[in-house]
């Protein structure tokens, strides 16, 4: 075979092998790319599963420890309801009720000394509001019974959340996730990193083979063009000739890589189908755990409703305590003012007596002065009456009536 025909044979052989290799590499590269995307997507899926399970776990702990034990148990039941309402407020109402009862008794023991009817100061006040706290105190045992009933429900709910949900369902969920994706041969991170590394290596192998075949094709094209000097042309011919003999081996390696890629894709597909079943089981378990968590959270509305009722009862009790305190203060002022009134009555009586004494003394002086005046008028008439005409001072010359007219009344106090 002539050198020219050999060059053409090298060229067409290189072109055919390169075209075949490009097609195989493209298909294999697509397979590797899809595997890579699938593994990365699964990595995100596993991370999302882990995050969601972690959220369910944290939410369960938050429900049990913060909401139920701390807020409902300690703050509401033990502090707000039992200590502040049933102990402290009840004690305050009892003290206020005893205080107002004592005030009423003091008024009942104090007789009204001003009208002589035998009435007491208690007869002058309304008894309408003195039993306000007594009625509320009767309601306290009912509230206490409700609180004890709610406490039993609370303890049952805490037990269910801690034992059934937190220690059972959620822990099993965490264990199932760890068994499916984080332990031993099922460690998905190790699995995905291992296969991603293989994918990168196979991509490199494909690229190397394709580069080698492309370089050979470029050399064949340059040799076929015949533009090189004779010595370089001869040297290139030998290189191309030797490379041409390696093409079958290179294509064999490529086909092995292609088979490895197909086998790898099959293994990944089988493994991910298994993981898909694990994922679905976990999602079902997560859904049940989340539904159970929501169910227990809905029970919190019971505590909220009871808390609203107790707060209203407490506000009503405090309002009545305030009214009773105002009444106690009013009764104190009433009793004190009555004592002051008695002193005021005595003062007025003394003033009336002083006025009576003054008027009696004045009356005596007026009578003495009037008697003296009468004698002097009589003497005047005896000496001068016969000489004065009546009409010079009509009705007065011979008038012997007193010059004063004194009438008075001292008000009886």
UniProtKB/Swiss-Prot annotation:
Keywords: Autophagy, Coiled coil, Cytoplasm, Membrane. Belongs to the ATG17 family. PANTHER family: AUTOPHAGY-RELATED PROTEIN 17. One of its GO terms (cellular component) is phagophore assembly site. GO terms for molecular function: molecular adaptor activity; protein kinase activator activity; SNARE binding. It comes from the Eukaryota. This is Autophagy-related protein 17. It is a peripheral membrane protein. Residues 262-300 form a coiled coil. Its main location: cytoplasm. It comes from Eremothecium gossypii (strain ATCC 10895 / CBS 109.51 / FGSC 9923 / NRRL Y-1056). Autophagy-specific protein that functions in response to autophagy-inducing signals as a scaffold to recruit other ATG proteins to organize pre-autophagosomal structure (PAS) formation. Modulates the timing and magnitude of the autophagy response, such as the size of the sequestering vesicles. Plays particularly a role in pexophagy and nucleophagy.
């Amino acid at each position: 075979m002539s050198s020219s025909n050999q060059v053409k044979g090298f060229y067409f052989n290189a072109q055919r092998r390169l075209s075949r290799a490009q097609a195989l590499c493209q298909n294999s590269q697509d397979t590797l790319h899809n595997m890579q995307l699938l593994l990365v997507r699964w990595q995100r899926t596993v991370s999302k599963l882990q995050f969601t399970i972690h959220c369910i776990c944290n939410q369960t702990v938050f429900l049990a420890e913060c909401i139920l034990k701390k807020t409902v148990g300690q703050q509401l039941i033990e502090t707000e309801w039992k200590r502040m309402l049933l102990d402290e407020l009840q004690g305050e109402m009892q003290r206020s009720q005893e205080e107002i009862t004592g005030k009423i008794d003091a008024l009942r023991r104090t007789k009204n000394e001003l009208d002589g009817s035998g009435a007491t100061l208690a007869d002058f006040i309304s008894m309408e509001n003195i039993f306000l706290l007594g009625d509320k105190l009767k309601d306290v045992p009912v509230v206490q019974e409700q609180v004890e009933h709610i406490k039993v429900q609370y303890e049952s709910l805490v037990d269910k959340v801690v034992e059934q949900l937190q220690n059972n369902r959620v822990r099993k969920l965490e264990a199932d996730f760890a068994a499916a994706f984080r332990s031993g041969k099922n460690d998905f991170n190790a699995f995905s990193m291992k296969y991603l590394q293989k994918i990168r290596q196979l991509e490199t192998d494909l690229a190397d083979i394709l580069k080698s075949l492309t370089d050979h094709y470029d050399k064949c094209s340059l040799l076929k063009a015949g533009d090189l000097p004779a010595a370089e042309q001869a040297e290139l011919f030998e290189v191309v000739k030797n490379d041409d003999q390696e093409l079958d081996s290179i294509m064999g390696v490529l086909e092995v890589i292609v088979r490895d890629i197909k086998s790898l894709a099959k293994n990944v597909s089988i493994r991910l189908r298994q993981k898909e079943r694990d994922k679905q089981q976990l999602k079902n378990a997560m859904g049940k755990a989340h539904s159970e968590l929501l169910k227990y959270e809905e029970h919190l509305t019971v505590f909220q409703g009871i808390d609203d009722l107790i707060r209203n009862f407490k506000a009503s009790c405090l309002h009545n305590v305030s009214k009773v305190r105002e009444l106690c203060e009013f009764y104190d002022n009433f009793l004190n003012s009555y004592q002051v009134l008695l002193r005021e009555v005595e003062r007025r009586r003394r003033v009336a007596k002083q006025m009576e004494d003054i008027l009696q003394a004045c009356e005596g002086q007026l009578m003495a002065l009037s008697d003296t005046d009468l004698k002097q008028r009589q003497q005047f008439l005896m000496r001068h009456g016969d000489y004065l005409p009546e009409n010079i001072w009509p009705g007065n010359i011979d008038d012997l009536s007193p010059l004063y007219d004194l009438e008075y009344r001292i008000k009886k106090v």
